[in-house]
Amino acid sequence: AYPISISGETIKNMGFGNTVRAGFGYMKSVLFKKKETSLKNFYINRFGAPLYRMFFEDYTEKLWGVNPEFISADWGAQRVKGLSLSKAVLSVLKKPFVRSTDSKKVETSLIEQFIYPKKGPGQLWETVAEEIEKLGGSIVMNAKVKTVKTSGGAVTGVVTQEKDGEKEYSGDWFFSSMPIKDLVAAMDAEVPKEVAHTAAELPYRDFITVGLLVDKLLIKNRTKMKTVSDIVPDCWIYVQERDVRIGRLQIFNNWSPYMVNDLENTVWIGLEYFCNEGDDMWNMSDADFIEFAKGELEHIGIIDAADVRDAVRVKVKKAYPAYFGSYADFPKVRRYLDTYENLYCIGRNGQHKYNNMDHSMLTAMKAVRAISGDGCRDDVWNVNAEKEYHEKKDS
């Protein structure tokens, strides 16, 4: 579950035998470090082999469709960072002596309170759009970039496909948050074969989410946290079970009460599935997939399917840039893109890096600073590259 917590309930659910095995497994991992040639070894070094098998292996394989043994440790370095079993335990021991509102020097995976927009993150971008338009800017929606025009080591414009035909836009500076695979393919320049091949083969995982409005959850709140209608306090729950394909469950009531119309009598949840465009899950009809998702949650005891009041399904392409396949040669692609003096790659897909929203925003800020002379191009790429940045907040 998230926020991550270690408690008597956690140990009770694991059982005495598993807890002892986890403890000895962690001590072994501390004494005999593995070379971090894969995500598997990265996890084992921080949590021990028993906890890796219990909590990380199956979920990670659901997420990426590939066993962690074949995934670069870079993903762990960006997402898990300094978090380990010892730090999780230390956080529990320090908790009585730390104010609940003080998140300084705390691993963010362990933070229990954080700022969240009243009506969800989309509200932030609605506000940004309003500010852009107030300042005289314009935002073109539903336009697919077909061609990136280049000349003399610079990007000169883009050609888009829009509802009423093709249009061309020119500019002085270009910020790209489109998937690098698509960016390189759209360039009208003679891209080196090795770069073009690497970019074309960059792997991604696609994403399906199902929103369910239900009368209640069957799982109970066994914590001391008070919640409306006493629902479980988790923001999301990771699902490790092999016999279901759901990877994660979000409980929107706990993100913000303003996102649920009838907070006291309904629960708004989001089921998350990781897949590949064109596979069996992706190709299912909305109605069939919603029934499939309801059945999975009922199977693992989260809901009674009869309690579902409403449902919606959303598919997202290239939601997760992946760290296997041609990713090993990604530095060659980066070096090529950096030869365009007025092009800055920003965001998660724009850098083929599993950034969170805050880091994606920061890449844009760093790009603007680089243009204004208060920084350099490397600063943009180096966001979330420092090992301690992502999961530890010092201020």
Describe each region flagged by the PLM.
Residues 19-151, 170:
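Active-site/ligand-binding neighborhood in enzyme catalytic cores
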Residues 1-31:
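Dinucleotide-binding Rossmann-like beta1-alpha1 core, especially the glycine-rich loop
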Residues 141-301, 329, 381-388:
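Mid-domain catalytic core of redox enzymes
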Residues 138-140, 309-312, 344:
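General small-molecule cofactor/ligand-binding pocket signal
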Residues 314-317, 324-395:
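C-terminal lid/capping helical subdomain adjacent to the catalytic/cofactor pocket in oxidative enzymes
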Residues 207, 303-315, 378:
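A short coil-to-beta-strand element that immediately follows conserved catalytic motifs
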